[in-house]
Amino acid sequence: MHKALPVMADTNPATLTMDPASIESRITERTRAIMPVHICGIPCDMDSINAIAKKHNLAVVEDACQAWLSQYKGRKCGTLGDLGCFSFQESKHLPAGEGGAITGNSDELLDRCESFHNCGRAFGSVQGKGYFMRGTNFRMKHYQAAILLAQFDKLQKETEHRWANADHLSAGLKQSPPWRKIISRKDRNVKP
């Protein structure tokens, strides 16, 4: 829609998250952002990723869809870059059918996101007559928001339950040679 072409970076086999060492070789003059994915609640190495982004003047858009309540050095995933994305798709931690949320530290980028999901209409710092950019109609319905809000009270308990299940599974697989534990919560300050 906006002619963006994703370029994949390698993953770190120890964490299954983006390997910062593989990022710089993939940056070109067309690169606009780095999008680390915090997978299975395990945060990426955000210090290294943010340093690379700063060096090359790139935005950092975190995919925190599987990292609700996870932390990196005491800060919640989704708050470590310029923008953080969360999904409400049915297989995620807070399902509401479809939809998502974006958090951020940049009013300009958040205004562009608002404009994009509201049919490209001008919003906030994104000014112009009528429509500013190509956009979509990605607005959550009221009933989806009601379903979502009812789940927030359960998020902490369900996240703790997921970590307990992961610990139990890891302990059971410990004796199986082909299996290895990827990372522990303590390694990256991951907390439910």
Residue ranges of model-derived segments:
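Short beta->alpha connector loops at strand-helix junctions that form conserved
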Residues: 8-12
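Structured binding elements
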Residues: 3
